[in-house]
Amino acid sequence: MKIPILPIVALLSLLALHAAQGAALGTPMEDTTSSNYPSGTEGLSEFLNFNKLQSAFKSDDFLNWHVLTDMFKKALPFINWEFFPKVKGLRSAVPDSQ
């Protein structure tokens, strides 16, 4: 079974950036609060751990490829990361000298 990693990573990064920017800047169209939603979504937020993602995007290591790959490996431990040779190969690559 193939799991589309790129769309999942893009969606998670957009969600983290959206939450980090304080959501919408204007007034809401309707009164929607977290109390309107069932409490069953708490498990999902603990699974995705948005606070950890926000802290990763605010740090100085935001553009560090190794930190980003380690963050996603820790956030998604159920994916077999050894299956992706490009991700595994980038960890051992020597950085380009400029």
From Swiss-Prot:
It is found in: Secreted. The keyword Iron does not apply. Transmembrane segments: none annotated. Ubiquitously expressed in stratified epithelium. InterPro entries: KRTDAP. Keywords: Differentiation, Secreted, Signal. Induction: Up-regulated in suprabasal cell layers of embryonic and adult epidermis. Coiled coil: none annotated. GO terms for cellular component: extracellular space; lamellar body. It comes from the Eukaryota. Residues 1-22 form the signal peptide. GO terms for biological process: cell differentiation; epidermis development. May act as a soluble regulator of keratinocyte differentiation. May play an important role in embryonic skin morphogenesis. This is Keratinocyte differentiation-associated protein. It comes from Rattus norvegicus.
